[in-house]
Amino acid sequence: MQIYEVTDARFRKYGKVIRNIDFSALTEAMKKTPVPSDVVYEPSIAELEALPVAKEIEKVFYGELPIQIGYCNGHNVLLNAVEYHRSSEINLAATDAVLILGSEADVTDDFTYETSKMEAFRIPAGAAVEVYATTLHYAPCHVDDAGFQVAVILPKGTNYPLDEAHAGGEDALLTAKNKWLIGHAEGGLPEGSHIEIGRAHV
């Protein structure tokens, strides 16, 4: 799979580089977070949310909606699933990382997806990008053996456990609050996750 830069014109349909917020303090704080041998996602970290930039993100980017700042860290070279939200997500790279992205418009009527349509983009350390709500994504991939550290910023409550059962049509894809998931049969995901047609590898 060819890897493009987030500054490439191809990235524009998936998101954009954020240039009007100073993320330097958050980048430094992220460097202190753990990098496991697999992948770990934490939706909300109090120490990150206590940084002054959190209020700026709420005001400037999310229109005064409350947010959560967590991280996705570790080592990964596979795409085992794709997910999307009803809101944009900010990814801030504390290390170089690769995002594998696709378009929700390419999900079929039976809620499957062909991963050969996805494209990979390198996000350099210190850069932050908006990932549009209509962009399919999942855990980043590392670019070297040191692994990756990526801050994940979303509206508060996203990716937390559901309060009710969901089934039928797109509703069946809802696996957590504000999280619709299409999974791969070999991806180690919960039974019942919808199955994608292909599988990507970087």
Segments predicted by a language model, with ranges:
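Active-site region of the double-stranded beta-helix
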Residues: 1-125, 136-199
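Aromatic-residue-lined binding/catalytic grooves and analogous aromatic/hydrophobic interfacial grooves
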Residues: 131
